[in-house]
Swiss-Prot record:
It is an enzyme of class 3 (hydrolase). This is Undecaprenyl-diphosphatase. Catalyzes the dephosphorylation of undecaprenyl diphosphate (UPP). Confers resistance to bacitracin. It comes from Janthinobacterium sp. (strain Marseille). It catalyses: di-trans,octa-cis-undecaprenyl diphosphate + H2O = di-trans,octa-cis-undecaprenyl phosphate + phosphate + H(+). It is a multi-pass membrane protein. It comes from the Bacteria. GO terms for cellular component: plasma membrane. Bacitracin is thought to be involved in the inhibition of peptidoglycan synthesis by sequestering undecaprenyl diphosphate, thereby reducing the pool of lipid carrier available.
């Protein structure tokens, strides 16, 4: 394996892991990082989706006890059945819309400038939701993921579907969408983690199968390296985020999105950075 190519795969994996579960858009950061590293092309787009499996496995490991309890109780326990059904319901909107529009979105919007615009718009939406929650008599209607109804799950799933637009953020859309519809910050964040499991796995399987002609057995080490880097960084990020939200809101991430998005737009306009499409 080419050492430079391996280093690029590791960097991309780290970027994926650290950004997948923060409301700042992993896809957007991967597009920008790939542009800077000159790591682009049709096969790289498959790589970017495939290494999400590493981030997904980090959630599986962190919540292995909860997941085992749900799987073990699927046939007998109402609580486990309800939780699993909520995940399926929330997964469907993005999955169905993705099947219809994913190719067009990749063709038109997987570029630095559209990503930067989505960063900025998403940042202002986060600020609006956080301000609403601070400045009103807002009280979370749903305190834990086990309190969610099927309608709550559907609403979060519809919010997550907006993340098909690169730069929006899957976790940001599902977390902020959940908070908008009455979930507590902790419930929205944890449900977003669980929702990532079928969402990321489904995206990986679909992308690898659809673009299988681009791939070969020789790609496995590179994909594995990126996936492992994503697993380690995502595991650290999930643990940190759970501590962070116990005492903080998401305002910092909103400002980060706005500032970083403006930087990308200005750097593209003035030629400070050469962003490859």
């Amino acid at each position: 394996m080419d050492p430079i190519l391996a280093l690029k795969a590791i960097i991309m994996g780290i970027v994926e892991g650290f950004t997948e579960f923060l409301p700042i858009s992993s896809t957007g950061h991967l597009i920008l990082a790939g542009s800077l590293l000159d790591f682009t092309g049709p096969k790289v787009k498959v790589f970017e989706i495939a290494i999400q499996t590493g981030a997904m496995l980090a959630v599986v490991w962190e919540y292995r006890a909860k997941i085992a309890a749900v799987l073990g109780g699927l046939l007998t326990e109402r609580k486990a059945q309800k939780f699993a059904l909520n995940i399926i319901i929330a997964f469907l909107p993005a999955a169905l819309l993705g099947l219809v529009f994913a190719s067009k979105i990749k063709e038109k919007l997987f570029a630095p400038v559209p990503v930067a615009i989505a960063f900025i718009v998403g940042g202002f939406i986060i600020l609006w939701i956080e301000k609403r929650n601070r400045n009103t008599d807002f009280v979370a209607r749903v305190e834990t993921v086990d309190d969610m109804t099927m309608l709550d799950a559907l609403k979060v799933g519809c919010a997550q579907a907006f993340a098909l637009i690169p730069g929006t953020s899957r976790s940001g859309a599902s977390i902020i969408g959940g908070m908008f519809f009455g979930l507590s910050r902790k419930a929205a964040t944890e449900f977003s983690f669980f929702l990532a499991i079928p969402t990321l796995m489904g995206a990986t399987v679909y992308s690898v199968y659809k673009d299988r002609a681009l791939l070969s057995m020789a790609d496995i080490p590179l994909f594995g390296l990126g996936g492992f880097a994503a697993f380690v960084s995502a595991f650290l990020c999930v643990r940190w985020l759970l501590r962070y939200i116990s005492t903080h809101d998401f305002t910092f991430f909103a400002y980060y999105r706005i500032v970083f998005g403006l930087f990308v737009l200005l750097s593209a306009y003035y030629g400070w950075v050469v962003w490859a499409d």
